[in-house]
């Protein structure tokens, strides 16, 4: 068995969902840009301070709480009945529930990287930094470990996930 789930699982757990109409309206009123405009690779590259203000306050401030359905997936995996989970969730809900074989097609807020030197940073470093987080080694702005609007999902990862199905 293979489990496929999208961002809806996160909404059910209370994770931030900027695609929710009411939340999207509130974000646009707050920042003057829609969530799709702000959670965009071009916005990140040209307005990094504004991007991180939005990202920290409105994207990663509420990572949700685990629900029984996620722990059920872990039990199925432990019993050898669940081959893998393929998800668009960026909050690593399946991994947080203890599942091992997870394909996070859109990445994870928990894995962040310096685009210059490759050093990895945990979510806490991003969240606790003042302004845009910078690499301690080279000073470059750290890149969130998630696919943003306007980016292509890793084709190799898509191929691996397709092989599982």
Language-model features: where?
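Conserved catalytic core of sirtuin-type NAD+-dependent deacylases
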Residues: 1-165
């Amino acid at each position: 068995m293979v489990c496929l789930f999208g961002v809806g699982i996160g909404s059910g757990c209370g994770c931030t969902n900027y695609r929710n109409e009411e939340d999207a309206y509130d974000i646009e009123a707050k920042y003057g840009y829609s969530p799709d405009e702000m959670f965009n690779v071009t916005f990140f590259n040209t307005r990094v301070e504004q991007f991180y203000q939005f990202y920290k306050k409105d994207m990663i401030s509420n990572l949700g709480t685990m629900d029984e359905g996620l722990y059920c997936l872990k039990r199925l995996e432990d019993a050898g009945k669940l081959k893998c989970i393929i998800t668009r969730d960026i909050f690593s809900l399946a991994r947080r529930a203890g599942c091992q074989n997870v394909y996070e097609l859109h990445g994870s807020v928990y894995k962040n990287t310096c685009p210059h030197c490759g050093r990895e940073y945990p979510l806490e470093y991003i969240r606790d930094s003042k302004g845009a987080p910078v690499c301690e080694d080279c000073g470059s702005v750290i890149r969130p470990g998630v696919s943003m609007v306007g980016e292509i999902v890793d084709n190799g990862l898509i191929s691996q996930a397709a092989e599982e199905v």
